[in-house]
């Protein structure tokens, strides 16, 4: 207890979503356990459970590809690391491009291999065996990650949290943080909604879609926009068998199998962005998106003649101007920001936790493949966004 009757900790993490508890887990793995996670609801109750859960390392930004590779290694060893099933299913991942993107696909695959990603180009005939229901005529080349697949972000968050608790880290649910405590240019803790405080040397803000307004109250502009993302579940009407995740960069859609025999559909067309209030948005696909689903899925998978939409849901992405995250020391001493994941957060979450832990403990990344400067907040004000070296026509920011 401090003199004001509040709590104390070396580190406070604001936000008990996936990235917040991944950070707690990573700190615990490094022996730093005087940590309190403050979550206004319950662990993973925000946008974590809305993730489509796709696991792939196919990024044109090398540091992101490396982070995804780290995430994959953790997911593969989940039973050993966490002692529980986190819902990871290793179906494989295929990405298909049209003729305009063949050269950049090959360059991207080569760059991914340089940072340890197991990936290769495969022939159309192989993809036809993997996805016999798909019309592959519009595609000119395909990339393949045998170790890719999909997972369950909510289950993964619970595993991170359980591991952190086992290490001695405190996770306080139903504990809303209203503001930072600041003395001059130094963060000294957080103020809670119940009027109490937690004093701390370091505060990690991992508040996702709520980050911009939270930090704006302290004069810190974090350029994050909130976009509603819609997902549709489809029963294909046929027995699919074991099919991989399929990222279609011709019609800009992605599908993945589901344990119930359904497929999950998402749209990856950046022309379809929709701003949203994360506290008041439509939590299902609208009629326009359902029509889009029927059109895109019907075109790519003509064998789905008896397909039926079974359900839908929506969540919100915290999107930065360059569609890459902010994992950075903030403008106040002792402040670290981990937000703006732009739809990439689940697959890289173990690496996010480790990078934040590095920044807190060492002041820099300990993984040479992942320079912390790539994700610095200041890059936007400097006019130096983080961009893929090998953009795809129509989907550059998403890769």
Annotate the PLM regions:
Residues 178-198, 203:
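Conserved beta-strand-loop-beta-strand element in the redox core of flavoprotein oxidoreductases
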Residues 295-399:
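C-terminal catalytic lobe of FAD-dependent flavoproteins
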Residues 236-334:
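Active-site lid/adjacent beta-loop-alpha segment flanking the redox-cofactor pocket in flavoenzymes
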Residues 194-244, 367:
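Central helical "cap/lid" subdomain
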Residues 28-48:
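Glycine-rich FAD pyrophosphate-binding loop
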Residues 52-130, 252-254, 297:
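Dinucleotide-binding Rossmann-like beta1-alpha1 core, especially the glycine-rich loop
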